[in-house]
């Protein structure tokens, strides 16, 4: 049974080079409209990315990241608890903290201890992501083998969570993202192995998990389709993740995911009711 308590992150990219064209919103008015629509159709949180992080992404300065997110934060000032900023730039992260966002999402997993005092003083939640690269954006050179992946991810999170906790960050603010696609390996088998073993990861780590598989490279490699046609495979992977312990899912299609969760819950209720009725019939 899928769970309504799953938190859905809708992906909003304020970029011109994100790998999925339909997620790009560079003009401020279009970004605001897209964010409001995401919240309307099923996003609990809008995850705002001012820079792409795929292997071919162009670098964006912290000043440009801040310039891109500022108008959106102005427009959503009364819903900041539903805004996540997806950036690994400390300057951008500090700006987001000052604006009072609900979440910071760092693909490097918050590696800079100099930022920890600012994080500890805030109350936002932190999406701490694992990547084989350890720093920077995804690359095609990280080759984490399937058989090594779970142990490597657990070791990374044990060390990073310990560092954050020692700096005064409460455990209930931490959300762990094992990374997917190129963040693990160009080989789809590594991501498939991690996705198949989410319950093991969750048991080992004891903290909420966020899974971000939407339109990732390993899905395309598995089903033989381009990014634009990976909506169904993405939804299937997301539902699998939720059914196997994911507490948060980051997606390009929050409305579709929310509808699928709602239908699954309704079906489960009918199944439970029918089972009870059969029990009464045989009493």
UniProtKB/Swiss-Prot annotation:
Q: What class of enzyme is it?
A: transferase
Q: Any keyword Transferase?
A: yes
Named from the GO MF annotations, one term is: dihydropteroate synthase activity
The keyword Transferase is assigned to this record? yes
Which is a GO BP term held by this UniProt record?
A: folic acid biosynthetic process
The protein depicted here goes by the name Dihydropteroate synthase type-1
- What is annotated about its quaternary structure and interactions? Homodimer or homotrimer.
> Record's family?
Belongs to the DHPS family.
Function text:
Catalyzes the condensation of para-aminobenzoate (pABA) with 6-hydroxymethyl-7,8-dihydropterin diphosphate (DHPt-PP) to form 7,8-dihydropteroate (H2Pte), the immediate precursor of folate derivatives. Implicated in resistance to sulfonamide.
EC number(s) on file: 2.5.1.15
Q: In which pathway does it act?
A: Cofactor biosynthesis; tetrahydrofolate biosynthesis; 7,8-dihydrofolate from 2-amino-4-hydroxy-6-hydroxymethyl-7,8-dihydropteridine diphosphate and 4-aminobenzoate: step 1/2
Taxonomy, top ranks, is: Bacteria, Bacillati, Actinomycetota, Actinomycetes, Mycobacteriales
Binding, Mg(2+): 13
* Assigned keywords, A-Z: Antibiotic resistance, Folate biosynthesis, Magnesium, Metal-binding, Transferase, Transposable element
Cross-referenced Pfam families, in alphabetical order?
A: Pterin_bind (PF00809)
């Amino acid at each position: 049974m899928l769970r309504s308590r799953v938190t859905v992150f809708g992906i909003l990219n304020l970029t011109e080079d994100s790998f999925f064209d339909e997620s790009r919103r560079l003009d401020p008015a279009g970004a605001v409209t897209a964010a409001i629509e995401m919240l309307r159709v099923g996003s609990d949180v809008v995850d705002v990315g001012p820079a792409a992080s795929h292997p071919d992404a162009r670098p964006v300065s912290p000043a440009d990241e801040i310039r891109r997110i500022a108008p959106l934060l102005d427009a959503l000032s009364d819903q900041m608890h539903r805004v996540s900023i997806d950036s690994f730039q400390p300057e951008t992260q500090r700006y987001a903290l000052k604006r009072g966002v609900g979440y910071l999402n760092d693909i490097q997993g918050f590696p800079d201890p100099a930022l920890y005092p600012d994080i500890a003083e805030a109350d936002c939640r932190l999406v701490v992501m694992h990547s084989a690269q350890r720093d920077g954006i995804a690359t095609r050179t990280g080759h984490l083998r399937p058989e090594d992946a779970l142990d490597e991810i657990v070791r990374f999170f044990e060390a990073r969570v310990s560092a954050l906790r020692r700096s005064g960050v409460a455990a209930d603010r931490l959300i762990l993202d094992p990374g997917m696609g190129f963040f693990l390996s160009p080989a789809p088998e590594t991501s498939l192995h991690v996705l198949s073993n989410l319950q093991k990861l969750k048991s080992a780590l004891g903290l909420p998990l966020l899974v971000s598989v939407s339109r990732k490279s390993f899905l395309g490699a598995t089903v033989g389709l381009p990014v634009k046609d990976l909506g169904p495979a993405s939804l299937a992977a997301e539902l699998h993740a939720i059914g196997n312990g994911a507490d948060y899912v980051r997606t390009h299609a929050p409305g579709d995911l929310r509808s699928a969760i709602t239908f699954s819950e309704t079906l489960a209720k009918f199944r439970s009711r029918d089972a009870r009725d059969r029990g009464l019939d045989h009493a």
